[in-house]
Amino acid sequence: MKPTLLILALLGSFASAQDYLEIAANPGGAGKGRSIVLVAGDEEYRTEETMPMLAKILAKTHGFNCIVLFSTDEKAGYIDPNNQKNIRGTEVLDNADLMIIGTRFRQLPEAQLAPFARYLNAGKPVIGIR
């Protein structure tokens, strides 16, 4: 019976997974009320590892709400830096105050690209890292 409960608990955690990683802000920081979206998507520089670390520093030390988007496998949903055609959750850019992007050679579908275009056309700030 216990293994069955463990399996059900694990399946439930996968079913409720988000399309992105959200790190809550430290309420006392200078970035209070501001949101940063960090976009990770390259196979060479391992931004899927470094962006969450940067997001945690920005959230916990400086008080920004941070969301990290990842290049993911379209079917299974796991983080896949080699997948150049899928970054889920790009609609969160509509509420971002800053975008930090570390991607290379992405070919996203129009639905995922449109939030990038809206963000850039709004004249909001971008930091690109490599």
Language-model segment annotations:
Residues 9, 129-130:
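Active-site-flanking alpha-helical
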Residues 19-28, 37-39, 43-129:
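Helical hinge/lid and interdomain linker segments adjacent to catalytic or ligand-binding clefts
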